[in-house]
Amino acid sequence: MATNNSYLLKNALFGNSAFSFISGLAAVLFSKAIANFLGLSASWIIFALGIGLILYGIEIFIAAKAEPVHKGIATFAVYADLAWVLGSAMLIFANLVDFTTAGKWAIAIVADIVLVFAILQFVGLRRLKNQA
């Protein structure tokens, strides 16, 4: 299946894909409840975010499924995940949005999970680069 010691990268991408897709699906199906939990009045923001996460999850899945793994999309995933983490921190600490305390914790926990995926994908890419 995986060649070039790409097991870590592929597994990280598959995990990221599943997490993103499932989170996106939940955001689309339960946008009003999630918005209320976070303290947002505009549930369309959660709905739109969900659509984006579904598309992102599909793209990352395609990259992971490719043989060999698509390094360009994997690199994009690392940067996109880091942007998500940075954006989450800004949302939590800048207080531009009046999130509930539970909402801030949820954002932080999701950001932690996304950061783990970014790190695993980065290490997987480095292993491929060092092998060449």
Please give the residue ranges for each predicted region.
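Alpha-helical membrane-associated segments of multi-pass integral membrane proteins
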Residues: 101-121
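Cytosolic juxtamembrane helix and N-cap/initiation of the first transmembrane helix
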Residues: 1-19
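Membrane-interface helix-boundary motifs at transmembrane edges
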Residues: 66-72, 99-100, 127-130
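Membrane-interface helix termini and inter-helical loops of multi-pass transporters
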Residues: 31-41, 94-102
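C-terminal ends of transmembrane helices
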Residues: 2-3, 8, 59-69, 121-122
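Membrane-helix boundary connector in multi-pass membrane proteins
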Residues: 86-106, 124
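Membrane-water interface at the C-terminal end of transmembrane alpha helices
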Residues: 95, 114-132
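Core segments of alpha-helical transmembrane spans in multipass integral membrane proteins
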Residues: 18-28, 43-65, 76-89, 112-116
